[in-house]
């Protein structure tokens, strides 16, 4: 039974909106409204109210106190039974509650004025996670890394959620371009996001798009680029222009003997992503590959060394790319970083 104000589009529970340079983000809501009267006796019965002039209002409130951040704002009614509103400058922070209500001529105290709400919404920074298994998270050792309100994840299901390990698990997945064939484990990104949130004082969102075993050619549109297309689809569906790309990849190049061209191909990948998003200075925060402890293979070691050097050089020759080493991190197995790392 639809009664009162219904939110149909615009924001989801746990969603983090990327702030702009001014430290704010626009949030748009739209939906329908229904004039309904409740019976005076139980069990409740619902009956339609004759058409009347309705006023729909919405506000942004702090979830912790109920205090209005943006006060009740009258919504536009483009046609009878529909409404929409845009809050053009919701400040960085949260978590927020988006709330609606209605009034209308002839209200008698029993007719519904209730409205839908969207809980746990924040404005802050959103990071997209790309690369292969050490970005996706494959280690399965125990990790003390609790979820924390204010850190959210856009799951492959297309739903925003409280961020928790494993970030990229595929329950109900609708974005299947990076559909893992087995369950991922933990990754460093939840810890990363919690640290950022505490230092910066506003929410952080994560969009995991990494795929285990992925060579660079699956990301580079000049070769294959299927994973980049999948990533852009996820970002586009939620109109996300991320704060930065978190990138851990390169292990596969050793097995494909393609390390010598890594720098040129990574440069092409970065350029393509920036052009597609219209963000020419989009930062890429990259992690050098660690090591492989499976076998003693001098050819593989050489390939990995070339990749590491290419990753180091990328931070010098591509603007807004930075690189951190990982060779001192402990391994969970022959190739994946452990919880200790």
Predicted regions and their residues:
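Cell-envelope and extracellular/periplasmic
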Residues: 1-341
């Amino acid at each position: 039974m639809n009664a009162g104000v219904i939110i149909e589009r615009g924001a989801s529970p746990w969603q983090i909106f990327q702030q702009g340079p001014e430290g704010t983000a626009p949030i748009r809501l739209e939906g329908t409204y229904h004039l309904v009267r409740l019976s005076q006796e139980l069990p409740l019965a619902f009956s339609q109210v004759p058409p009347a002039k309705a006023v729909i209002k919405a506000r942004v409130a702090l979830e912790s106190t109920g205090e209005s951040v943006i006060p009740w704002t009258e919504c536009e009614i483009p046609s009878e039974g529909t409404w929409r509103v845009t809050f053009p400058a919701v400040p960085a922070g949260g978590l927020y509650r988006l709330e609606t209500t209605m009034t209308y001529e002839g209200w008698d105290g029993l007719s519904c004025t209730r409205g839908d709400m969207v809980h746990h919404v924040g404005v802050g920074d959103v990071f997209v996670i790309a690369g292969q298994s050490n970005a996706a998270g494959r280690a399965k050792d125990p990790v003390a890394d609790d979820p924390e309100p204010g850190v959210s994840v856009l799951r492959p299901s297309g739903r925003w959620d409280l961020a928790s390990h494993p970030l990229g698990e595929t329950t109900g997945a609708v974005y299947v371009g990076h559909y893992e064939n087995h369950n991922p484990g933990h990754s460093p990104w939840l810890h990363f996001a919690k640290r950022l949130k505490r230092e910066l004082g506003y929410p952080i969102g994560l969009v995991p798009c990494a795929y285990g075993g992925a060579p660079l050619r699956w990301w580079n549109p000049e070769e294959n680029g299927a994973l980049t297309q999948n990533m852009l689809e996820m970002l586009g569906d939620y109109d996300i222009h991320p704060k930065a790309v978190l990138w851990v990849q390169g292990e596969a190049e050793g097995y494909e003997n393609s390390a010598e061209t890594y720098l040129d191909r990574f440069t092409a990948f970065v350029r393509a992503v920036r052009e597609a998003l219209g963000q020419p200075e989009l930062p890429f925060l990259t992690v050098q590959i660690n090591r492989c402890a499976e076998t003693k293979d001098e050819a593989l070691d050489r390939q990995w060394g070339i990749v590491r050097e290419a990753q180091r050089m990328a931070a010098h020759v591509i603007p807004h790319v930075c690189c951190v080493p990982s060779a001192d991190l402990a391994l969970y197995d022959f190739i994946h970083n452990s919880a200790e790392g």
